[in-house]
């Protein structure tokens, strides 16, 4: 199962390290906002005005509010660019 964590852990760790504000969408449609304070195999601790422990199995999507660098385990780094879709909601 460790191979399945090879993308998730560096992504969440970079969000935590750089204090990137995120929107977390749950499978029931609820949107949570804050910064990733900590995480483990099963939960993400999200901090805003209060800290919330969010179970990963309840998460649909994690959306960073700005671009950030994700460090690679091979010594390099890659840039995650949060795309803003100006047409979202317009129909």
Swiss-Prot record:
Residues 9-68 form the Sm domain. The keyword RNA-binding applies. Signal peptide: none annotated. Keywords: RNA-binding, Stress response. GO terms for molecular function: RNA binding. Disulfide bonds: none annotated. It comes from the Bacteria. One of its GO terms (cellular component) is cytosol. One of its GO terms (biological process) is regulation of DNA-templated transcription. Residues 71-91 have a biased composition (Polar residues). Residues 66-91 are annotated as: Disordered. The keyword RNA-binding applies. RNA chaperone that binds small regulatory RNA (sRNAs) and mRNAs to facilitate mRNA translational regulation in response to envelope stress, environmental stress and changes in metabolite concentrations. Also binds with high specificity to tRNAs. Homohexamer. Belongs to the Hfq family. This is RNA-binding protein Hfq. It comes from Shewanella amazonensis (strain ATCC BAA-1098 / SB2B). The lineage of its organism: Bacteria, Pseudomonadati, Pseudomonadota, Gammaproteobacteria, Alteromonadales.
């Amino acid at each position: 199962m460790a191979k399945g964590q090879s993308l998730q852990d560096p992504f969440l760790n970079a969000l935590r390290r750089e204090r990137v504000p995120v929107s977390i969408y749950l499978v029931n449609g609820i949107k949570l906002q804050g910064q990733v304070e900590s995480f483990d195999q099963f939960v993400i601790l999200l901090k805003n005005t209060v800290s919330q422990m969010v179970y990963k199995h309840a998460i649909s999507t994690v959306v960073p509010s700005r671009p950030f660098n994700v460090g690679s385990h091979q010594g390099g780094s890659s840039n995650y660019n949060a795309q803003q879709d100006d047409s979202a909601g317009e129909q």
